[in-house]
A protein has these predicted regions:
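Residues that define the transmembrane beta-barrel architecture of outer-membrane proteins
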Residues: 45, 64-70, 78, 92-98, ...
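Outer-membrane beta-barrel "beta-signal"
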Residues: 53-55, 166-176
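Outer-membrane beta-barrel translocator/channel fold
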Residues: 63, 116-143
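Transmembrane beta-barrel domains of outer membrane proteins
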Residues: 73, 101-105, 149-151, 173-175
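Outer-membrane beta-barrel channels and translocator barrels
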Residues: 75-79, 105-110, 153-155
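Short glycine/proline- and aromatic-enriched beta-strand/turn motifs that initiate or cap beta-hairpins
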Residues: 25-76, 85-86
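Cleavable N-terminal export/targeting peptides
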Residues: 1-42
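Transmembrane beta-strands of outer-membrane beta-barrel proteins
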Residues: 45-51, 80-82, 113-117, 158-160, ...
Length: 176
């Protein structure tokens, strides 16, 4: 009998994210304290685990592969965050994105609607695809990713991430 079979890169991503969950439930802060807003109240949730099963590419390319992402954020005072995401990029290469960000709640006066922007360093677009992202040097490049989300409940949300001129990523987030 075959149980759940994942490609090795996806299995590694899942294992890393699951291994990080117990650590994030502790009171220790993993993000540098200077990233939070001094004097702002502590966030109501410790962190967020995000999963993206689907990415829509603007241009159809036979080289494109399915993109799967697993990310974990630590929430900081002042609606700031830092985190790391593990994903298979558009060409099937294992990739990582370490980032800091800001979340803007109550977008357009709607409590469920929010926007988020993250900025950081990405690694993973290596030969022969190093020219597929701007400012790439040996697989390392800066990245800025804006997104819009909708809170389904106090813990659950869906988000759309705008990946430059390349794609839209659809994801589900669970705060803990």
């Amino acid at each position: 009998m075959k149980l759940l079979q994942l490609p090795p890169t996806r299995a590694i991503f899942c294992a890393l994210a699951l291994a990080a969950l117990p650590a994030l439930s502790q009171e220790t802060r993993y993000c540098p304290s200077f990233l939070g807003v001094k004097g702002a109240p502590e966030p109501t949730h410790r962190g967020e685990l995000t999963f993206s099963p689907y990415t829509y590419h603007w241009s159809q390319n036979p080289q494109h592969k399915q993109v799967v992402l697993l990310a974990i954020d630590e929430q900081l005072p002042g609606n700031r965050l830092c985190g790391v995401s593990f994903f298979s990029n558009s060409f099937g290469q294992p990739s990582i994105y370490a980032y800091v960000g800001q979340q803007f709640n109550n977008l357009m006066g709607r409590p469920q609607l929010f926007a988020k922007v993250t900025a950081g360093i990405m690694y993973g677009y290596v030969a022969p695809y190093e020219n597929k992202v701007p400012l790439n040097y040996h697989g390392i490049n800066p990245a800025v990713i804006p997104s819009v989300g909708y809170k389904l409940s106090p813990h659950d949300s869906v988000q759309v991430k705008f990946l430059g001129t390349a794609a839209l990523m659809f994801s589900y987030g669970r705060q803990f």
